[in-house]
Amino acid sequence: MKRILTLCAMLLMLVAGASCKKNNKSMNNQIDKQEKILFINGSPNCEGNTAALAKVLLEGKEYETLNLTDYRINVYGQTLDGDQFDEVYKKMKDADIVVMGSPVYWHNICASVRVLLERFYGPIESGSFKGKKLFFLYQGAAPTKMMIDDGEYTMSRFAGMYGFTYEGMANGKSQARKLKEKL
């Protein structure tokens, strides 16, 4: 009987050890996998204030910058040659975290970001970005509370419709530093 109990105990330790090793390996893979971050800069000034705000938020992180001014994205409903929406969409799908940056123009999100958002409507299924995070950087020269609220409303609705987890908005460096905690 002692021998059977000893064998059972050894077998239990062997199984438990293998299970722990498997779980540990799984945890290491999660730690080793660095999240892929895409910063979409809607500003026509690629090195301007929107990009500077992204640098504050993403300091110490590896990320890719996609300047919308470098892409031709036709407005919703146009079917012109040379449209690059699919390229931008693919980069967004490949990312774990998307940081959308827009200057405040005419009291709202800039046209290049607006066109990108509008192009999702229709061809892109709701919930397509489930499990991905969206951060919003929205800056301008003294935007009013209404402008900030409207921009955030638009971005949070976009995130909700397409399945992103909306992590929030920053419109200044101190807010970007605080938002960085969610990365």
Language-model region placement:
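C-terminal motif of bacterial Sec signal peptides marking the signal peptidase cleavage site
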Residues: 15-19
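Short, glycine/serine-rich, charged loops/turns that create anion-binding
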Residues: 11-12, 44-45, 141-143
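Short, glycine-/small-residue-rich phosphate/pyrophosphate-handling segment
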Residues: 130-168
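N-terminal beta1-alpha1-beta2 submodule of the flavodoxin-like/Rossmannoid cofactor-binding fold
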Residues: 20-125, 156, 160-183
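Sec-dependent signal peptide recognition
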Residues: 2-7
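Alpha-helical transmembrane segments and their juxtamembrane interfaces
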Residues: 12-13, 77
